[in-house]
Amino acid sequence: MSIEDLDTVLKIESASFPRPWTRRHFLDEMEHPGSFPTVAATGDGEVAGYLCLKQVLDEAEILDVAVDPTFRGSGIGRALVDWAIAFCRVRKLRLLCLEVRVGNHEAISLYRHLGFAEVGRRKNYYENGDDAILMDLSIAQVEECDAV
């Protein structure tokens, strides 16, 4: 992710979440040495989605991931999560974690398909009272992927 990507990333973020991250939040992630924000682009360089990953010791956490509504269902989300998994494999991390809103059925289905398991919930985590589902993926159990 670069400064040039931010306007598009912010549009996708606003279209995807009721409480979107701010420009400052993305800039902080871009400047933090343990954070690895990335974008997925179309063949003509248009940003179609993004993922923000943070590494802490031998674990990584997906902090934010979203796909432009016009590109949803095209495999961009999966490609971004595959990138995160490959990142963990290359760095020999043991665990990839995330949290997802209980009502985000498409994302939950994708994560389960990729091997993530529910490990807990944060009750009433979101402003509207929705729970957050905590999910983990053991990197040692993941088959090789070449997304990096």
Residue ranges and their predicted role:
Residues 8, 109-110:
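Well-formed, non-transmembrane alpha-helical positions, independent of function
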Residues 62, 96-100:
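Conserved hydrophobic beta-strand within the GNAT/NAT acetyltransferase core sheet
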Residues 67, 101-102:
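Short amphipathic helical patch at the helix-1/turn junction of helix-turn-helix
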Residues 99, 112, 117-133:
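Conserved catalytic-core motifs of GNAT/GCN5-like acyltransferases
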